[in-house]
């Protein structure tokens, strides 16, 4: 680098408490590449957050909400082109293409580095580079890992403060030579001298790139959510799943909850659902009337890191410190705990603004306000919505809220040792075929259930099945390596635990979404899902019966506690039945998935499929 070029770079301003020479060198290298106007090391303080939020209010990026309605809360509206994760621009750049597998986008690492070098060269001109240190998981936990994100977005800095343990304390844990995942993010919109900024800078060209071997993340062009908050899906799932593969643990797209029985016995459950299946609602479940004395507590709503503990049991932490939840559909009816969490200290993105300075989204109330400003800054009324179909909030509008504000938060949620998992639950959105609840006969069959799970992508008409999108383990967009190898990894983790004499968690498959002949959902869902949870826990403690069926073990009508709910045996039959013709079709679809993943597919899963086919043939005979 020439002296003239060096002279144009800003001072690094490294705080005296940052002692990590390798990290400082890395920051210096990124500064030299991206050429920001300033470098700011985030300390995670309230004063810093207030300053950055005020800066964004002045820039038009955010607006402060009515403090009487939502204390210390803000609303951001993104560019209409930058509203969601971009799966087609998300790359796993492993050294070998087969390590990414057929379900990921792969690019040769050397070529991708070349491309990104060109894009990031001068990408932060005129902007501030924020150094954002964060811990995924409680600081110092043996299950936690540290990352550092370099971003030119103050929106990223303030959201990461809520979503992770972010700030000065991270440097104490990192010390002079600790391991960290390097993350680089730019909105990709450099500013020339004197050029006015826009409220939501972004670039039509987008890349979200992961290098599994070097544990690096580079993101360009988007300021939104999972594309820019690199601790979330990029680190906590794509990179962490690869770390787990190499080190013998699991990084999963799962909620974690605690369930305490009326007698005071506590269980912990981790559950994986694809999007639009009510994951956050289940994580914050309130037991229904008739189930007095049961208590459900929330440890996490989206991601679980699970490592074998010293006792041999699988122990899980929520690596996040906040909720980045979908707002539309969240209401006092569907999720009162989430609504209580959102009362203060929240950043809302792409929801509507009310005339009194509060927020609204579809599904929040039965009757919408008479007038709103929608997520694109336009006037909105119920009449306009009826005439044009225009939504007040974007369907993927989000809230970023501290987990500590959740009324149902579990007292163990920050236990650095994690909580011991008693059961795994996997579920999708299926209008037919899959029963309300099934217990796997063993670990291998449970892995088979999770590997073949899916959701309908279209609302099924009466008597018609929607198109099923397979989403193994709800990890299809988030697994950082070959999906067949991921199945092998789950089998290997179970085998290691069994060999060590540990008690394996039971595995269950659920489906809240079976429809009746009238095309309506039969199962009431929401809090009533507690009845299914109670049956599972009864199975764990040896108190609940069950009957063998083709796919595993399911409850009979008398095995479920119906206190306080009118649900007939006929209705129960509609949600629990296993129809042979539908299952023949289902198994054929499983076969299609296995063909796609044929290279490296565990033989144990092919045997599990053959076993189900054999049982199905026996039923028909």
From Swiss-Prot:
The active site is at 277. The keyword Plastid does not apply. Its cofactor is Mn(2+). InterPro entries: PEP_carboxykin_GTP_CS (IPR018091), PEP_carboxykinase_C (IPR013035), PEP_carboxykinase_GTP (IPR008209), PEP_carboxykinase_GTP_C (IPR035077), PEP_carboxykinase_GTP_N (IPR035078), PEP_carboxykinase_N (IPR008210). Keywords: Cytoplasm, Decarboxylase, Gluconeogenesis, GTP-binding, Lyase, Manganese, Metal-binding, Nucleotide-binding. Binds 1 Mn(2+) ion per subunit. Pfam families: PEPCK_GTP, PEPCK_N. Its EC number is 4.1.1.32. It comes from the Bacteria. One of its GO terms (molecular function) is phosphoenolpyruvate carboxykinase (GTP) activity. It is an enzyme of class 4 (lyase). It is found in: Cytoplasm. Substrate binds at residues 85, 224-226, 275, 396-398. GO terms for biological process: cellular response to glucose stimulus; gluconeogenesis; glycerol biosynthetic process from pyruvate; oxaloacetate metabolic process; propionate catabolic process; response to lipid; response to starvation. The keyword Cell cycle does not apply. GTP binds at residues 276-281, 398, 429, 526-529. Pathway: Carbohydrate biosynthesis; gluconeogenesis. GO terms for cellular component: cytosol. It catalyses: oxaloacetate + GTP = phosphoenolpyruvate + GDP + CO2. NCBIfam families: PRK04210.1 (NF003253). Monomer. Belongs to the phosphoenolpyruvate carboxykinase [GTP] family. Catalyzes the conversion of oxaloacetate (OAA) to phosphoenolpyruvate (PEP), the rate-limiting step in the metabolic pathway that produces glucose from lactate and other precursors derived from the citric acid cycle. This is Phosphoenolpyruvate carboxykinase [GTP]. It comes from Bordetella avium (strain 197N). The gene is pckG.
């Amino acid at each position: 680098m020439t002296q003239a070029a060096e002279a144009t770079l800003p001072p690094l301003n490294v705080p005296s408490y940052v002692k990590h020479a390798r990290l400082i060198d890395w920051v210096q290298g990124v500064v030299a590449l991206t050429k920001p106007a300033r470098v700011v090391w985030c300390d995670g303080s309230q004063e810093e957050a207030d300053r950055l939020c005020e800066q964004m209010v002045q820039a038009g990026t955010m607006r402060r909400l009515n403090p009487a309605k939502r204390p210390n809360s803000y609303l951001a509206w993104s560019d209409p082109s930058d509203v969601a994760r971009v799966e087609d621009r998300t790359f796993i750049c492993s050294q070998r293409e087969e390590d990414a597998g057929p379900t990921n986008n792969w690019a040769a690492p050397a070529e991708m580095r070349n491309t990104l070098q060109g894009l990031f060269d001068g990408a932060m001109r005129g902007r501030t580079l924020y150094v954002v240190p964060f811990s995924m998981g409680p600081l110092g936990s043996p299950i936690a890992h540290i990352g550092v994100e370099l971003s030119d977005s103050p929106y990223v800095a303030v959201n990461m403060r809520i979503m992770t343990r972010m700030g000065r304390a991270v440097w104490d844990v990192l010390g002079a030579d600790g391991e960290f995942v390097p993350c680089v993010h730019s909105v990709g919109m450099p500013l020339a001298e004197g050029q006015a900024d826009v409220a939501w800078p972004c670039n039509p060209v987008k890349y979200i790139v992961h290098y599994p071997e070097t544990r690096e993340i580079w993101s360009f062009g988007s300021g939104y959510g999972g594309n820019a908050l690199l601790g979330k899906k990029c680190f906590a799932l794509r990179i962490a799943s690869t770390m787990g593969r190499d080190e013998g643990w699991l990084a999963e797209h799962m909620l974690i909850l605690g369930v305490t029985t009326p007698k005071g016995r506590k269980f912990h459950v981790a559950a994986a659902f694809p999007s639009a299946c009510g994951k956050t609602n289940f994580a914050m479940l309130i037991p229904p009337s008739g189930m007095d004395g049961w208590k459900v507590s929330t440890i996490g709503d989206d991601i679980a890191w699970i490592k074998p503990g010293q006792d041999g049991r699988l122990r899980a932490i929520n690596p996040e410190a906040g909720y980045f939840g979908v707002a539309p559909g969240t209401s006092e009816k569907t999720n009162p705990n989430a609504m209580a969490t959102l009362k203060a200290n929240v950043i809302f993105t792409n929801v509507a603004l009310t005339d009194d300075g509060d927020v609204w989204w579809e599904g929040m109330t039965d009757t919408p306000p008479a007038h709103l400003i929608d997520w694109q800054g336009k006037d909105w009324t119920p009449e306009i919505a009826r005439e044009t179909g225009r939504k007040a909030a974007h369907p993927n509008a989000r809230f970023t809220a501290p987990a500590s504000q959740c009324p149902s938060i579990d007292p163990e949620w920050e236990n650095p040792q994690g909580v011991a998992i008693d059961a795994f639950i996997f579920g999708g959105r299926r209008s037919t075929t899959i029963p309300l609840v099934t217990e796997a006969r063993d670990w291998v069959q449970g892995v088979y259930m999770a590997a073949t799970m899916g959701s309908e992508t279209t609302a099924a008409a009466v008597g018609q099945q929607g198109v099923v999108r397979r989403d193994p383990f709800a990890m299809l967009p988030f697994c950082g390596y070959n999906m067949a190898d991921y199945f092998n990894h789950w089998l290997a983790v179970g085998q290691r635990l069994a060999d060590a004499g540990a008690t394996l968690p039971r595995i269950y498959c659920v489906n809240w979404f079976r429809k009746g002949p009238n095309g309506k959902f039969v199962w009431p869902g929401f809090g009533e899902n507690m009845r299914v949870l109670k049956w599972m826990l009864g199975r764990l403690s040896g108190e609940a019966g069950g009957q063998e069926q083709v796919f595993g073990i399911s409850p009979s009508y008398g095995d479920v506690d119906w206190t306080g709910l009118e649900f007939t045996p006929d209705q129960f039959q509609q949600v629990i039945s296993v129809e042979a013709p539908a299952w023949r079709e289902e198994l054929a679809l499983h076969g299609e998935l296995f063909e796609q993943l044929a290279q490296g597919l565990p033989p144990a899963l092919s045997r599990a499929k053959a076993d189900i086919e054999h049982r199905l043939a026996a039923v028909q005979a």
